[in-house]
Amino acid sequence: MPKTPPLRLGVNIDHIATVRNARGGRHPDPVRAALAAIEAGADGITAHLREDRRHIRDNDMERLKAEISKPLNFEMAATPDMVRIALGIKPHAVCLVPERREELTTEGGLDVVGQRESLAPSIARFNDAGIRVSLFIAADPAQIEMAARLKAPAIEIHTGAWCDAITDDEPAKAAEEWRRIVAGAALAQAAGLEVHAGHGLDYATAETIAALPQIVELNIGFYMIGEALFVGLGETVKAMRATMDRGRARVIAA
């Protein structure tokens, strides 16, 4: 039996910047948060530079690239301006996401099938630059297969619908969404894609999904920043890391 790969924790620091921007100025500093998360055990940092700059700013991305010791995952819409910025910063990875100005957060997965003609050149440019590309998509077979055809090295499965169904106490819907995630992760791995997951994850759902052996990275932000208000960011990262390790141990023990 092949060895189960370790599970990485990427901490999304967007909402440190949300708090900062509520009053303007430089406090709290998202780069300081990133450094604290890494010190506590984060394997990487995720930040989303939105077109409207509602939280993370250009200078934040530049400082993150310069100051953190772990990989930077640059979330972005695949627009010409964002592609230019990302190529200039040269993060370890980019995650291409859909984006609408009126949304509170990223509401759905990228339509890779419908946007394949526009996405292909951006993916190729990042591949040529040595920047690892992931596509934030639903666990839909057509989207997964197109991601592989476009030569994206990785996908990030959108876990929001599953997490929302659990929060809303809709067990039938949660079970259906979970089946899609399980099948999607297996299909993606079979297609040669590295599999990540994220959106809406908390301690309970992170522990559950950590048991899927195909998934090698979880990107978690909003829940952790909320928990950090009560116990501190370092303690939250340590608790999430321990939670993920418990879930992963179930794979190893199986």
Curated annotation (Swiss-Prot):
Its subcellular locations are: Cytoplasm
Q: Which cysteines are joined by disulfide bonds?
A: none
One protein family per Pfam: PdxJ
Q: Per its UniProt record, what InterPro entries does this chain match?
A: Aldolase_TIM (IPR013785), PyrdxlP_synth_PdxJ (IPR004569), Pyridoxine-5'_phos_synth (IPR036130)
Query: What GO cellular component term, any one, is given?
Result: cytosol
Positions of the catalytic residues: H48 (proton acceptor), E75 (proton acceptor), H199 (proton donor)
Specify the pathway: Cofactor biosynthesis; pyridoxine 5'-phosphate biosynthesis; pyridoxine 5'-phosphate from D-erythrose 4-phosphate: step 5/5
Q: Enumerate the SUPFAM superfamilies for this protein.
A: Pyridoxine 5'-phosphate synthase (SSF63892)
What this protein catalyses is: 3-amino-2-oxopropyl phosphate + 1-deoxy-D-xylulose 5-phosphate = pyridoxine 5'-phosphate + phosphate + 2 H2O + H(+)
Q: Which GO terms describe its biological process?
A: pyridoxine biosynthetic process
Binding of 1-deoxy-D-xylulose 5-phosphate occurs at D14, H15, R50, H55, T105
Q: Domain of life, per the record?
A: Bacteria
How does this chain assemble?
A: Homooctamer; tetramer of dimers.
Cross-referenced HAMAP family: PdxJ (MF_00279)
NCBIfam families registered for this protein in UniProt: pdxJ (TIGR00559), PRK05265.1-2 (NF003624), PRK05265.1-3 (NF003625), PRK05265.1-5 (NF003627)
The name this protein goes by in its record: Pyridoxine 5'-phosphate synthase
Q: Which species is listed as the source?
A: Rhodopseudomonas palustris (strain BisB5)
